């Protein structure tokens, strides 16, 4: 089952540039939370801080608390690799390993964690592909086709399966449908509804209609700060801050 995420006074930097400023947010378990805002507002940096991907960039670092369940992922002695096992990530552009089969793409994280038993891998691959609504489309050529041979929408669902294979608590999705056609986008959105039954889902999106369709909660970012965080219905119908209203109604962004 998914776990809640509580962010307290999170600040992120690229060298001397202060790009996330005193962010507080509480994301409910087994719900979809959408993050919206104009380009460069900090929402993608924020989501990367939730599994410590931000620190993989030279001179980038973060300060503050991020509790996944009851564990602060920035606590001294916490290994980033353990954090990323609990908090999976799916990126804007599908990135399957091009030389690997569909099967090996999904099993790659498990193998990195030392799992070698075929029966265990087989079960995990099928479970993950079923959870990402891809199993029926690829089950007959798991070992014959590479991940790169799939369509764009299938590749993105393969990347979701790869993230799910290690059984995370949280799934982060950074504009997962922005590079896809409308039909593939619809499948990704449908998938979010089923994924939240077992995972906490956080999605970055530029698509306001998508946020309204898929998320129970929405946070609006602007210039590195969270301007407003509330239920999606309230954000889109009666926002408390005029800047939120201006963004949602297209006055800027």
UniProtKB/Swiss-Prot annotation:
Reaction it catalyzes: phosphate(out) + ATP + H2O = ADP + 2 phosphate(in) + H(+)
GO MF entry, a single one: ATP binding
Coiled-coil region: none
BP GO terms, sorted: phosphate ion transmembrane transport
Family: Belongs to the ABC transporter superfamily. Phosphate importer (TC 3.A.1.7) family.
Role summary: Part of the ABC transporter complex PstSACB involved in phosphate import. Responsible for energy coupling to the transport system.
Name of the protein: Phosphate import ATP-binding protein PstB
Source organism of the structure: Koribacter versatilis (strain Ellin345)
Gene name, Swiss-Prot/TrEMBL: pstB
């Amino acid at each position: 089952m998914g776990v809640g995420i509580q962010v307290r006074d999170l600040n992120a930097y690229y060298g001397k540039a202060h790009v996330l400023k005193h962010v507080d947010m509480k994301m409910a378990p087994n719900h979809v939370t959408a993050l919206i805002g104009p380009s460069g507002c900090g929402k993608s940096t924020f989501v990367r801080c939730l599994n410590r991907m931000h620190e993989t960039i030279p001179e980038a670092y973060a300060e503050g608390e991020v509790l996944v369940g009851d564990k602060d992922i920035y606590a001294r002695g916490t290994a980033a690799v353990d954090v990323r096992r609990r908090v999976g990530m799916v990126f804007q552009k599908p990135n399957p390993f091009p030389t690997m089969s569909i099967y090996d793409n999904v099993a790659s994280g498990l193998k990195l964690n030392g799992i070698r038993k075929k029966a265990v891998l087989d079960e995990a691959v099928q479970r993950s592909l079923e959870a990402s609504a891809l199993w029926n489309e690829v089950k007959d050529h798991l070992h014959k086709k590479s991940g790169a041979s799939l369509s764009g929408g299938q590749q993105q669902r393969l990347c979701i399966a790869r993230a799910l294979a290690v059984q995370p608590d949280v799934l982060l999705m950074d504009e997962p449908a922005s590079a896809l056609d409308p039909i593939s986008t619809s499948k990704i959105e449908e998938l979010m509804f089923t994924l939240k039954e077992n995972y906490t889902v956080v999605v970055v999106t530029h698509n306001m209609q998508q946020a309204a369709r898929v998320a129970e909660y929405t946070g609006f970012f602007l210039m590195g700060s969270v301007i407003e965080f509330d239920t999606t219905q309230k954000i889109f119908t009666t926002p408390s801050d005029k800047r939120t209203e201006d963004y949602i109604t297209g006055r800027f962004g």
